[in-house]
Amino acid sequence: MITVLVILAIAVAVGGLVLAVAFERGPTPGDVALAYELAWDRHDFTTLWSLSSGEMRDGRSRNDFVVDKKAAYRGQIRLRAVVEHVEIEAVAQQNERAASVLTRLDLRDEPPVRNEIRMQRIHGAWRVVSYMLRPEPASTP
């Protein structure tokens, strides 16, 4: 009798775990935007490739993308590790497959910048399809 109860308890636990994994939606668009901004700041080109859509990768393999980005940013030390804080200002999810995130980057020695990161859900994961600098809002006197 105890053996049957133990087997039943294990089966229920495994079933619950399977259901929990099946219903997990993964990172939100805000999570992906935060990771994308930090990857740019750290020149983590492998992570950028993973978070980007095919269009943002220009059709390059992971290895080619990383090699090309490292070559492009070699010697550009002033462009690395300049972000002190990333804030998600707004998330607009148009539907289950499209979202837009506005971020604000507080920089170490420069005024803050804002970006708009557009994403699509591709094969169950949010991927960046567009990354644009947003102009600063006009200040009122």
Regions from the PLM with identified roles:
Residues M1-A9, T46-M56, D109-P112, P135-S139:
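Short, charge-rich amphipathic segments
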Residues M1-R42:
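Short, low-complexity N-terminal intrinsically disordered segments enriched in polar/charged residues
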Residues R25, G30-D31, A35, T46-S100, ...:
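Short solvent-exposed beta->alpha transition segments
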Residues T28, E37-W40, R57-S61, L107-P111, ...:
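Extracytoplasmic/periplasmic, Sec-exported soluble proteins
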Residues H85-P141:
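Exposed beta-sheet edge and beta->alpha loop/turn motif
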